[in-house]
């Protein structure tokens, strides 16, 4: 008698456009995007962007605040994340207004994903401990994600 158990992990692949960083996945710090393992179903991501964007023929540097979001990932899915725009003015305006800045697709289809700016902590380094900010965010909202 052989009993086979399968873990509820999706063997999804994740592609991040240049400059996009995955800070945490389901509350766990991700040092290398290749190590990111999605669970089948809802996954909580914290992303930010650091790099150069086009601004009236010049290149302007921008480093965004982290955004938190939940993406529904079926098994064996391909998840692609890019910026909504490569225009500095558009991304800067959206960050200032706390509007979405990322474009997310699952298996080639645009995913409807609510993106929020991760609430900062008080003090000199408002995003110095992103995993703790995610824990606080989830606790306040009664959210639980498997890692």
Question: Which ranges hold each PLM region?
Answer:
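Sec-dependent N-terminal signal peptides
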Residues: 1-2
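N-terminal signal peptide c-region/cleavage motif recognized by signal peptidases
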Residues: 5-8
